[in-house]
Amino acid sequence: MSSFTHFNDQGRAKMVDISDKKATVRTAIARSSIVVTKEIYDKISHNEIGKGDVLAVAQIAGIMAAKRTSDIIPMCHPLLLKGVDVSFDWKQSDEQYRLLIEVKVKTEGSTGVEMEALTAASATALTVYDMCKAVDKGMIIGETYLLEKTGGKSGDYTRKS
């Protein structure tokens, strides 16, 4: 495990200087999920949620969150993102409906986009909750995690199952 780089000589927080790092293509894929009732699943599927098209709004929220990550995560560098893709997949078991959220982020720069992907996945799930809470507040946001990252000095990473 490498040492922490976000502390100065006095032990105080600092933003890491990345000016000497080589600009490379960097990608990250993050996942999250939200479990909803059959009623919410049906309303989302038939576009019957009063606030609008849940998946379209959540997708836009995820993209916006990726772009604004450095505004809410203190030590993240502002990045020029080259692409953000938010996708959805439903999984059903018994009366449980799980909306799987996957976010892919890409840049060419001196630092990775893991935090942008994770922030986007989280904001996407939170937006689904916000738009559907009038129907049922018992929704459960699942684990949010990094699935994969490429590029940079630390190399590639793929989450083990």
UniProtKB/Swiss-Prot annotation:
Catalysed reaction, written as an equation: (8S)-3',8-cyclo-7,8-dihydroguanosine 5'-triphosphate = cyclic pyranopterin phosphate + diphosphate
One Pfam short name: MoaC
Pathway entry: Cofactor biosynthesis; molybdopterin biosynthesis
InterPro entries in the record: MoaC, MoaC_bact/euk, MoaC_sf, MoCo_biosynth_MoaA/MoaC, Mopterin_CF_biosynth-C_dom
Binding site for substrate: 75-77, 115-116
Keyword line: Lyase, Molybdenum cofactor biosynthesis
GO MF annotation terms: cyclic pyranopterin monophosphate synthase activity
This enzyme's EC code(s): 4.6.1.17
GO biological process, alphabetically ordered: Mo-molybdopterin cofactor biosynthetic process
UniProt-annotated catalytic positions: 130
UniProt xrefs under Gene3D superfamilies: Molybdopterin cofactor biosynthesis C (MoaC) domain
PANTHER family: CYCLIC PYRANOPTERIN MONOPHOSPHATE SYNTHASE (PTHR22960:SF29), MOLYBDOPTERIN COFACTOR SYNTHESIS PROTEIN A (PTHR22960)
Oligomeric and partner information: Homohexamer; trimer of dimers.
Protein family membership: Belongs to the MoaC family.
Function: Catalyzes the conversion of (8S)-3',8-cyclo-7,8-dihydroguanosine 5'-triphosphate to cyclic pyranopterin monophosphate (cPMP).
Name of the protein this chain belongs to: Cyclic pyranopterin monophosphate synthase
Species whose genome carries this gene: Bacillus thuringiensis subsp. konkukian (strain 97-27)
Lineage of producing organism: Bacteria, Bacillati, Bacillota, Bacilli, Bacillales
